[in-house]
């Protein structure tokens, strides 16, 4: 069964769109790189160009040479602009169902 999760983020760098998807695979790759989502959040808040590039590569499922060019593109685009978008993506990884998940009111007995 396929579900569209809350929090898919498109980031445009140097005319190329990177679609970051809130998947368990992305979470695992980011956690492996930063020791957890908190470490990734700290890298974004510290305006780490390489940290932002790693998150983009993990979220977009990039590997090898595709992933290697992302840091330069983040730097060219401006890390502040990129970090704002990545904060939204990381928030979605903490809660992939989104803010409206669940029932508005309790079920009646």
What are these regions (language model features)?
Residues 56-58:
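Intrinsically disordered, low-complexity regions enriched in acidic/Ser/Thr/Pro/Gln residues
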């Amino acid at each position: 069964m396929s579900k569209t999760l809350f929090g898919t983020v498109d980031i445009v760098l140097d005319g190329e769109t990177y679609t970051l998807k809130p998947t368990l695979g992305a979470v695992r790759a980011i956690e492996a790189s930063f020791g957890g989502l908190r470490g990734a959040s700290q890298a974004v808040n510290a305006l780490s160009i390489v940290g932002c590039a790693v998150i983009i590569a993990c979220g977009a499922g990039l590997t090898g040479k595709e992933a290697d060019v992302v840091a330069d593109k983040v730097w060219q685009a401006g890390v502040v602009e990129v970090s704002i978008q990545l904060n939204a993506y990381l928030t979605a990884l903490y809660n992939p169902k989104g803010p409206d998940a669940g029932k508005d009111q309790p079920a009646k007995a």
